[in-house]
UniProtKB/Swiss-Prot annotation:
Region (Disordered): 262-286
Gene giving rise to this polypeptide: Iqch
Domain IQ stretches: 406-435
One annotated GO biological process: gene expression
Official protein name in the record: IQ domain-containing protein H
Length: 1071
C-alpha cells in the first residue's frame, strides 16, 4: 500500500520511511550491551518513547492515507495562463499538522552528528509547510513563481497583465464516504461476465445488502440446510428427435378405465408439446402410439386428475388418485387435510358419490391453508358435479341423514329452542327498554316543558306588572306628556291567536295598511317611529317623504312652501321579518326578536318622553315595551281579546244599555244553539235573516247567514198561532211551546242545507264552519229587516286620564258583500250626530269602567224599521284597536289642515293663511268665488287588482297624473294613494277628498274606472274588487239622489204649509 502511494504522494513515502527507521533504531537499541549504556532505566524510558512515537505515526499514517484516498482536492484554474502546469501531486491541507507526535530528546541521539539540527528543522518545518502550502495553492501570490522554481525547478513564464477573475470562495470537495460496490445490471443477467470479488467492507454490510447490490445472486445457497425444492436444469429434447408417447392403458380393460400412463411418476417427462411443434410429429403419433381412442385412454394434464369419493371415502387405489398423489407429494400434507375435511363434509350430508377435481383442489389449497376450514361453496368448487350435489344439500333434513345425524338434530332442536327463548326474552326486554326510553324521554320533555312554561309565565307576569306600573305613570303624567315634546312608536300589529293569524291571507300586508299613522307629526311636538312589516324601498320612502312634506304647503296653498320633515319620522323594519317568513308571527313578535331594531329605537327615544300605540295588543307587545322601557297607550292584552270578541262586546253593550239586534252569545254546544235559535225565531218572527259570527274571526271570515223563515214549512202556521194568541200572550212560554217543537225539528236540516258562508275559501262547508264556531264560541244575531241598511264605524279614544273622546265616524262601503267593509265615507251622514255621539259615549264610559284604555272602534248599523217607519240604530261590534279608518282620517286631516267636528258630523277646512301679496293675487282671481269650508272624504284600504303588480309605482303615478288623478293644494281636494309594499303590489289604498258627498263618490268611482281600464286587457282581467266597489258607489249615489228628492219634496211641502198659515199670522199681527 505504501508503494501504491509512493508514486503519487512523497509525504506518504517519507512518513513510512520514518516509521521504518524508528523500527530499526528500536532493534539496534535492544542489542546494545549494558556497558555501552549509562543505565538500564534510561534504556527503558527510551524504548517506551519510541513505542509511543511508532504507534502515533502508525495512526496518523492510516489517517493520512484515508484522507488522500477519499478526498479530491481542486486547485483554482486561471484562464489567463497560456500553458498551465499541474503537478502530479499536491500537499493536502486537510492534514492536521498538530496531530503529529514526535519523539522526545534522548541521550541515544547525541552520538549522531546532526541530531540538534534535525530537531530544530522539525520544529521549524510546521510553519514553513503551512506557508508553502498556502503559496502553492494561490497562483496569483507573488511568491508562487519563486516557490515552484525552488521546489520543482520549473520556471514559469512571465505574465505582465492578468485578467480579473472572481475569487473562489471555497474548495469544491467530494463525498467523504466511500461508495459501496454495486454490480452493474449487465453483469446480473449475462452469465459470461466474471463475478466481482466480494471485499471485506462489502461483506461487513450484511448478506441482505450484498443481495440487493447484486454481489450475491438471488438464487445462491447461503445456508447449510437443504431447500424443499432444488433448482435444476430441465432436459430439453431436440426438435428433430421423434419420441413415442405411450398411450396404451396399464391396466386390464375389464377394470374401470383410468387415464394414468406409467410415465406419470417422472415429472421431468410430463412436458406438453407446443402447438407449433406438435404439427411436425402428428403423423408418427397416429401411426405408432394411438391404438385405442377412448376418453379414458386420452393423456391428461397433471392438473386434470379426477378421482371419486364413495360414501364419504376417497378411492385411494384409483390410478388418478395415485397419480395425483405422486404429482403433488411435496405438498401432500395440506392436500391430505383438505381431503379429510371434504370426506367429513360428504359424510355429514350423506352424499353417496362425488368426484373431486384435482385442479380445483390445488387452486383452493392456498386459501385453505390460510383459513384452515372449508365452506360449502369451497367444497362445491372442487367437485365435478356441483349442481347435483347442491340439490342434495338443499333437501330438507339432509344433514341429519349423515354421520351423527341424531346428535346434530338434537343439537339443532336445542339450539332452536334456546334461540327462541332468548329471542322472546330479548324482544320482551327490547320492548320494555323502548317503553322505558319513551317514558323517560316523555318525562324529560314534560319536565323541560314545565320548566320553560314556568319561566315564560314568570316572564309574562313580570312584563304585565311592569306594564301596569308604567301605565300608572303615564296616567299620572298624561296632561304634561301630551303637550310636551314626545315620540310615538306605532306598532300596527295584529295580535290575534296563532290559529287566526295562520289563516289570514298575506298577513304582512294586512299589518301595513295604517301608514296614515305617520301623520301624527301634524303636531309640532310629536316625532313618529313607525314599525313596518315590509322592507321599505327607497322609492316608497321618497314617496312618503314628499307626501308628508306638504304640511306647510297645505296651510298656505302654495306648493313652494313645502318643508322636509324626514327627521321627524322614522320607518323601521325589524330584521326578523326576513328570517321568520313562514311562521305567521305578528309584528310585535318580529320586533321582539330583532335586537338591531330595538337598539335603534332605544337610541332614537333616548332622553325623550315616548309611548307605544299598538294594534291588537299581544303579550309580545308587553315584552317589547319592557325592552324599550316605555308605556303602552292601550289595555292589557287579555282585556283586549276578551272584549274584542263578539261575545265580549255583547256584554259591554248589555251593560251600556244600548240598542242591539236580537240575538244570543256565548254559544259553545250544538244543543244550546238549536234551542236558543228556535226561541229567537219564535220571538222575532219578523226577522227574515239570522247571522252567525265567530268570536275571534274578523273581516267577515267567521261569518255565515241563513234566511230561516223562508225555508220553514211551519212558518205560516206559526204566524197564525201568534195571531190567534195575540201579541201580549204570544210572549208567554206556554203559548210558544208547540211552535218551538216544530221549529226545532226543522232547524237542523235548514241550517245544513241553506246556510250561506261569507268566506267559502276559509270555510267551504257548513260542517267545518260549525265545528270551528262551537270551538271558538260565537253569537247569533238578527239582520236588520229592511232593504236599505247602512253600517257605520266610530273611532274613539279613552285617554290615560279617563277622558273619552270621539275621533272619527264614517259610513261603510261594502264592495265584497254586506258583511265585509271595504272603505268608508267620512264624516257620516246616516244618523243624527247627537244620537250617535250619545250611544258611543255610553259605550265608552262602560269600557272605561272595565279598565279599557286607548283606541277602540264601534260598529253600528242603521235602517228604517218597516213596522214603525222610524230609524233604528243597533250596535253590532267592538274592536279595541287602532282602526284603518282612523289612520285614513289622520291622513285626511293632514292634507286638508281641517278639523273633524264629530258632534256636528262635519269636516271643516280653515281659510288659507297668506301674506298680503299672495292674498291680492288670489282675490283678483277668485274675487267673486266664496271658498267652501267643508269637505267630504271617501277612503279605502282594501282596493286590490292583480294587474297592479305588472307595473311599477312610478309608472302607475305617472299614469294617474296623465289622467288628472291627483291632489290640488289650492282647493285642498283630490286623490292620494297609500302604497303598502313594492314586491307584490296587488293592493293599495286610496283617499279622495271633495266638497260634497255626491261629488266625492263620483270622483272616487271615476278614478277606479280609469285605473281599471288602463291596467286591464280584454283577455287579462285579473281578480279585482274595483267593479264591485263602483257598483256599490253607484247604489249609494242612487239612494242619495232619492233621499235628496225626498228631502226637496218634504221641504216644499213644509214651505206650503208655512204659506197657508202666514195670512193668519199677518192678520193676527194687524189685529
Amino acid at each position: 500500500m505504501a508503494q501504491a502511494q509512493e508514486d503519487s504522494d512523497p509525504i506518504g513515502s517519507i512518513l513510512i520511511q520514518v516509521h521504518e527507521d524508528l523500527h530499526q533504531l528500536k532493534e539496534k537499541l535492544v542489542k546494545f550491551s549494558a556497558e555501552e549504556t549509562r543505565s538500564t532505566l534510561d534504556i527503558q524510558n527510551l524504548e517506551t518513547a519510541i513505542q509511543r512515537t511508532e504507534m502515533g505515526l502508525k495512526i496518523h499514517i492510516d489517517k493520512y492515507l484515508g484522507v488522500v484516498n477519499q478526498e479530491v482536492l481542486m486547485a483554482p484554474v486561471k484562464k489567463s495562463l497560456e500553458s498551465p502546469v499541474t503537478s502530479k501531486w499536491s500537499i493536502p491541507t486537510v492534514i492536521d499538522q498538530k496531530s503529529f507526535i514526535f519523539p522526545m530528546d534522548s541521550d541515544f541521539w547525541r552520538p549522531q552528528k546532526h541530531r540538534g539540527s534535525l530537531l530544530h528543522g522539525l520544529r521549524r518545518a510546521k510553519p514553513k509547510i503551512q506557508l508553502t502550502t498556502k503559496v502553492m495553492q494561490d497562483p496569483e501570490n507573488k511568491h508562487h513563481r519563486a516557490a515552484v522554481t525552488a521546489s520543482y525547478g520549473i520556471s514559469l513564464p512571465h505574465i505582465n497583465q492578468r485578467k480579473a477573475q472572481d475569487k473562489v470562495q471555497r474548495l469544491i470537495k467530494g463525498s467523504t464516504i466511500s461508495n459501496l460496490t454495486v454490480l452493474p445490471p449487465s453483469h446480473r443477467t449475462d452469465p459470461h461476465f466474471i463475478p466481482i470479488p466480494v471485499l471485506q467492507k462489502d461483506a461487513s454490510k450484511g448478506v441482505l445488502s450484498m443481495i440487493e447490490r447484486g454481489l450475491i445472486p438471488p438464487t445462491a445457497r447461503i445456508t447449510f440446510q437443504n431447500p424443499p425444492i432444488k433448482p435444476q436444469a430441465l432436459p430439453l429434447h431436440s426438435f428433430d428427435e421423434h419420441r413415442k408417447v405411450p398411450m396404451e392403458a396399464s391396466f386390464p380393460l375389464a377394470l374401470k378405465p383410468r387415464p394414468v400412463p406409467e410415465e406419470v411418476e417422472e415429472p421431468s417427462h410430463q412436458i406438453e408439446i407446443p402447438k407449433g411443434r406438435a404439427k411436425r410429429s402428428r403423423g408418427p403419433l397416429r401411426r405408432k402410439g394411438m391404438k385405442i381412442r377412448t376418453p379414458s385412454k386420452t393423456r391428461k394434464s397433471p392438473w386434470d386428475y379426477i378421482f371419486s369419493v364413495y360414501n364419504g371415502c376417497v378411492d385411494r387405489t384409483a390410478p388418478d388418485f395415485l397419480a395425483f398423489k405422486s404429482r403433488f407429494k411435496l405438498i401432500w400434507g395440506s392436500i391430505f387435510s383438505f381431503l379429510e375435511q371434504i370426506e367429513k363434509f360428504l359424510k355429514d350430508y350423506a352424499i353417496s358419490e362425488a368426484k373431486i377435481k384435482g385442479k380445483s383442489l390445488v387452486s383452493l389449497l392456498p386459501e385453505f391453508e390460510l383459513k384452515n376450514k372449508l365452506t360449502r361453496n369451497d367444497v362445491l368448487a372442487v367437485l365435478e358435479n356441483p349442481v347435483h350435489i347442491q340439490m342434495l344439500l338443499n333437501l330438507p333434513g339432509q344433514r341429519y341423514k349423515g354421520q351423527d345425524g341424531k346428535a346434530e338434530a338434537a343439537t339443532k332442536i336445542q339450539a332452536t329452542w334456546k334461540s327462541y327463548k332468548a329471542r322472546s326474552s330479548f324482544i320482551s326486554y327490547r320492548q320494555k327498554k323502548w317503553a322505558s326510553g319513551v317514558i323517560a324521554l316523555a318525562w324529560l320533555l314534560h319536565c323541560h316543558r314545565t320548566r320553560l312554561k314556568r319561566i315564560v309565565k314568570e316572564s309574562r307576569q313580570r312584563h304585565l306588572e311592569n306594564f301596569r306600573i308604567r301605565a300608572q305613570h303615564l296616567a299620572a303624567n298624561w296632561s304634561r306628556i301630551r303637550t310636551s315634546r314626545r315620540t310615538i312608536i306605532h306598532i300596527p300589529s295584529l295580535g290575534y291567536s296563532q290559529y287566526v293569524r295562520k289563516h289570514i291571507f298575506d298577513l304582512d300586508v294586512e299589518q301595513n295598511m295604517q301608514l296614515g299613522r305617520l301623520c301624527d307629526i301634524i303636531d309640532a311636538n310629536v316625532n313618529v317611529i313607525y314599525i313596518c312589516s315590509h322592507p321599505m324601498t327607497d322609492e316608497l320612502k321618497l314617496y312618503y317623504r314628499k307626501l308628508l312634506s306638504l304640511q306647510a304647503a297645505v296651510k298656505t296653498g302654495y306648493y313652494g312652501d313645502r318643508t322636509d320633515l324626514q327627521n321627524r319620522f322614522r320607518i323601521i323594519t325589524p330584521e326578523a321579518v326576513n328570517v321568520f317568513t313562514k311562521h305567521h308571527m305578528c309584528l310585535a313578535t318580529h320586533l321582539m326578536y330583532s335586537p338591531k331594531a330595538i337598539k335603534r329605537i332605544k337610541n332614537l327615544i333616548r332622553g325623550e318622553e315616548a309611548y307605544i300605540v299598538g294594534g291588537i295588543l299581544h303579550r309580545d307587545d308587553l315584552a317589547v315595551a319592557d325592552m324599550l322601557n316605555v308605556p303602552i297607550l292601550g289595555s292589557e292584552p287579555e282585556l283586549v281579546h276578551l272584549y274584542s270578541a263578539k261575545s265580549g262586546s255583547k256584554r259591554i253593550f248589555d251593560n251600556a244599555n244600548v240598542p242591539m239586534p236580537p240575538g244570543i252569545y256565548d254559544i259553545y254546544t250544538y244543543q244550546q244553539m238549536i234551542e236558543q235559535l228556535s226561541q229567537l225565531v219564535t220571538d222575532n218572527l219578523g226577522i227574515r235573516r239570522w247571522v252567525f259570527k265567530m268570536n275571534t274571526e274578523f273581516g267577515g271570515n267567521g261569518t255565515a247567514f241563513c234566511d230561516i223563515p223562508s225555508h220553514l214549512q211551519c212558518y205560516n202556521w206559526v204566524l197564525k198561532e201568534r195571531n190567534r194568541f195575540g201579541h201580549e200572550d204570544w210572549k208567554k212560554k206556554w203559548a210558544q211551546e208547540s211552535a218551538l217543537v216544530k221549529i226545532s225539528e226543522e232547524l237542523a236540516g235548514i241550517l245544513a242545507q241553506h246556510v250561506q258562508l261569507v268566506n267559502e275559501k276559509r270555510f267551504p262547508t257548513w260542517r267545518k264552519f260549525l265545528h270551528m264556531f262551537l270551538t271558538q264560541g260565537g253569537v247569533i244575531e238578527a239582520y236588520p229587516p229592511a232593504d236599505s241598511v247602512t253600517n257605520l264605524t266610530v273611532d274613539m279614544l279613552i285617554e290615560p286620564d279617563g277622558e273619552v273622546r270621539v275621533l272619527s265616524m264614517g259610513d261603510q262601503l261594502h264592495a265584497d258583500g254586506p258583511f265585509i267593509s271595504s272603505g268608508t265615507t267620512m264624516p257620516q251622514t246616516s244618523v243624527d250626530p247627537q244620537v250617535l255621539n250619545s250611544l258611543c259615549l255610553q259605550i265608552g264610559n262602560i269600557c272605561k269602567e272595565k279598565d279599557v284604555v286607548g283606541y277602540f272602534s264601534i260598529d253600528l248599523v242603521t235602517f228604517i224599521d218597516p213596522s214603525t217607519l222610524e230609524q233604528q240604530v243597533w250596535t253590532t261590534g267592538l274592536n279595541l284597536s287602532y282602526s284603518d279608518q282612523l289612520a285614513m282620517t289622520q291622513l285626511t286631516l293632514y292634507l286638508t289642515n281641517g278639523h273633524l267636528n264629530c258632534s256636528l258630523s262635519t269636516l271643516e277646512v280653515p281659510r288659507f293663511t297668506e301674506d298680503s301679496e299672495r292674498e291680492r293675487k288670489r282675490l283678483s282671481i277668485q274675487a267673486e268665488l266664496a271658498p267652501e269650508t267643508s269637505r267630504y272624504a271617501v277612503m279605502s284600504t282594501q282596493l286590490k287588482h292583480d294587474n297592479l303588480s305588472l307595473i311599477f309605482y312610478y309608472v302607475f303615478l305617472q299614469m294617474c297624473k296623465a289622467h288628472g288623478i291627483g291632489y290640488d293644494l289650492e282647493d285642498r281636494q283630490g286623490t292620494v294613494f297609500i302604497l303598502y309594499e313594492s314586491l307584490k303590489r296587488y293592493k293599495l289604498g286610496m283617499l279622495t277628498i271633495g266638497v260634497d258627498l255626491q261629488g266625492v263618490l263620483m270622483t272616487f268611482a271615476r278614478n277606479l274606472f280609469i285605473i281599471h281600464q288602463e291596467i286591464s286587457a280584454p283577455d287579462m282581467q285579473g281578480e279585482t274588487n274595483f267593479k264591485t266597489t263602483i257598483d256599490d258607489i253607484e247604489t249609494i249615489l242612487g239612494v242619495t239622489e232619492e233621499n235628496k228628492m225626498i228631502f226637496v219634496r218634504e221641504k216644499q211641502s213644509k214651505e206650503e204649509e208655512d204659506n197657508l198659515y202666514e195670512p193668519v199670522e199677518i192678520h193676527s199681527e194687524i189685529v
